[in-house]
Amino acid sequence: NVDELIILDISRERKYDINREDLNYQNLDSILAIFKDFSRKSFMPLTLGGGVKTLSDIEDRLRAGADKVAINSAAIHQPDFLEKAAGRFGSQALVASIDALELGTDCWEVFTDFGKTATGLNPLNAAQRLESAGAGEILVNSINRDGQCQGFDMPLISAVTESVDVPVIGLGGGGTTQHFVECFENTKVSALAASNIFQYTEQAVFNLNHELNTLGINIRPAAISNMETF
């Protein structure tokens, strides 16, 4: 019942070997190996991101099974890189990711490099620039609300969606059904993404999907199907 899965590699040391040598466990020591193993078992659209700095990084992730590749810091700091990527792989394969920190009422700044580097950019201007450079979608994340489950930053999401023509995915703060309903009803966002609600709430995917449909939100209906255990 998930429409799409976004995997963002936010590890800093790039060490993936967990030193587990069980008989029935294949140890995976690189992010590409993890991606390949995951995509082999996944039957939904898959977006992979994190650590993307070169055209080869994009190609590697697409070859690993990604339908789309999310790019954050490299896209913000090097618009020409995104242009080259769009020319080679097509805009439909590229998601530009924006991490925005709220500085005051209706005032945000784009940060990169794990939220450490201030860019001086407004997320609206950044989104427009990324769209012009060739991004097929924009993923906008609220740093302030990330992991808080206190609701989406609707002013931020609304401002970004109004500034571009490409689809916008909102991220950061989704913790209850009402948070999703409010954001869908009060913004023009194309999709909403979340993590904690799905990781720590029993049957969250099915229940959220069902509740949104019941409340009239236009999304694909939930369905129960046979599931294979991997």
Regions found by a protein language model. Give the residues of each.
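Conserved, mostly hydrophobic/aromatic
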Residues: 5, 61, 96, 130, ...
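Charged helix-capping and loop-helix junction motifs
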Residues: 21-34, 119-124, 150-158
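Conserved anion-binding
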Residues: 62, 66-140, 144-145
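Glycine-rich, proline-tolerant flexible connector loops at the mouths of alpha/beta enzymes
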Residues: 4-30, 73, 139-150
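Catalytic cores of alpha/beta
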Residues: 37-65, 155-192
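Glycine-rich phosphate-binding active-site loops on the catalytic face of alpha/beta enzymes
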Residues: 12, 60-81, 142-147, 170-206
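Hydrophobic faces of well-ordered beta-strands that scaffold small-molecule active sites
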Residues: 5-7, 46-50, 69-71, 94-98, ...
